[in-house]
Regions:
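Conserved catalytic cores of phosphodiester-cleaving nucleases, focusing on short active-site segments
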Residues: 37-52, 56, 63
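Long, low-complexity, charged/polar intrinsically disordered regions in eukaryotic proteins
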Residues: 92-161
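A structural signal for short, well-ordered beta-strand segments and their strand-loop junctions
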Residues: 70-73, 125
Length: 161
């Protein structure tokens, strides 16, 4: 699996969102209560979470009694896919995905942190992003696309915030 580009092995979407919400890198990756906050402004914590909200529970237990916490959830709105051949390094021309993201896609992740949703210190930002996604041609189907591994996603535009 490819490692991320930035601090703590983060990938492009995470790094771009972090720099968008806090251009001052002194606010990035701040240790608080045995955890590392993506962004700490001095008054609030901002966590960029691209998936797996269930992994946030222990962090929320530590952060919410101390500070307001905003979870930013980037959702792919319009996505262009390109495929990377692992053997040759060749990248296919991009094509538009038939799926269009919307805020309702957050419900599955929000369900994983439902006990925290009524906490007045918890805030959510759903960021709809148009993005380019690169996938490896390493899946199990004949054309190697089904079950393939996502290599990276690159945001190209904020569709809605």
């Amino acid at each position: 699996m490819r490692q991320g580009i930035g601090t703590l092995s983060e990938k492009t979407v995470h790094a771009v969102m972090k720099n968008y919400y806090a251009p001052d890198t002194d606010m990035h990756e701040i240790p608080i209560e045995n955890f590392v906050a993506d962004i700490y402004t001095g008054q609030e914590i901002i966590e960029i979470q691209t998936r797996a909200f269930n992994k946030m529970r222990r962090k929320l237990d530590a952060f919410l009694p101390l500070y307001p916490v905003t979870i930013v959830y980037p959702i792919p709105h319009i996505k262009w896919l390109s495929w990377i051949n692992e053997e040759t390094g060749e990248t296919s021309p991009k094509r538009k995905s038939p799926k269009t993201g919307n805020p309702y896609m957050a419900f599955i992740e929000l369900y994983k942190i439902r006990p925290y949703l009524s906490n007045p210190n918890l805030h959510l930002k759903l960021a709809l992003l148009d993005m380019e996604e690169y996938r490896l041609l390493n899946g199990w189907s004949r054309d190697k696309k089904k079950g393939s591994e996502r290599y990276d996603r690159i945001p190209v535009k904020f569709a809605e915030e």
